């Protein structure tokens, strides 16, 4: 049998859980009760992503377009997303005999800006930063090292695209 003290603690914990549960809502759920309002998923699919200038930017662009539309046809764009990236290599471990790095980290930093198409005030709807890091081992075989670096670049680009998608979705969910 439960004591009165344990019963009151259990009741308090249950009450807190119920209150906290009422505060949470799904990010991509339909939260627009008024007809004509768009939910987050519809607003994300109406984002046009700028053209890419290199392979890494194209990887990020492809990941963003798929995350926004889910592979479906995009509707008429309401927003334009601009992403600028900077990348660098960081040598983590250096072989003491050859003075060559044996492990490197590919660092990708991105700044992004979401603008409303047709807006004349010049203020962004949302802007932010994202970053991705991916390590890889350097081999004595040149082509293995090139492929490992390319895979690290792709992994870092995926992380950046996921961070951008999550930040924009959270902003659009809280700022209709």
Regions found by a protein language model. Name each.
Residues 41-76:
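Post-signal-peptide N-terminal segment of Sec-exported extracytoplasmic proteins
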Residues 147-176:
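C-terminal/domain-edge helix-coil "capping" segments
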Residues 46, 50, 54, 143-154:
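Active-site oxyanion-binding pockets that recognize sulfate/phosphate
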Residues 2-3, 24-29, 79:
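Hydrophobic and amphipathic membrane-targeting/association helices
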Residues 1-23:
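Sec-dependent bacterial lipoprotein signal peptides
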Residues 17-43:
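Bacterial Sec signal peptide processing site at the extreme N-terminus
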Residues 66, 71-151:
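Surface-exposed short loop/turn segments
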């Amino acid at each position: 049998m439960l004591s009165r003290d344990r019963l009151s603690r259990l009741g308090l914990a249950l009450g807190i859980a119920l209150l906290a549960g009422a505060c949470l809502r799904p990010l991509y759920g339909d939260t627009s009760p008024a007809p004509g309002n768009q939910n987050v998923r519809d607003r994300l699919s109406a984002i046009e992503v700028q053209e890419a200038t290199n392979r890494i930017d194209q990887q990020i662009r492809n990941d963003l377009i798929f995350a926004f539309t889910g592979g479906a046809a995009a509707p008429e764009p309401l927003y334009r997303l601009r992403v600028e990236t900077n990348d660098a290599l960081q040598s983590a471990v250096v072989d003491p005999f050859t003075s060559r790095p044996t492990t490197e980290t590919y660092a990708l930093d991105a700044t992004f800006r979401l603008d409303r198409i047709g807006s004349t005030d010049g203020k962004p709807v949302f802007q932010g930063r994202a970053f991705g890091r991916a390590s890889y081992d350097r081999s004595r075989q040149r082509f293995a090292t090139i492929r490992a670096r390319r895979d690290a670049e792709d992994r870092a680009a995926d992380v950046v695209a996921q961070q951008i998608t999550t930040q924009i979705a959270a902003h659009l969910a809280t700022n209709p």
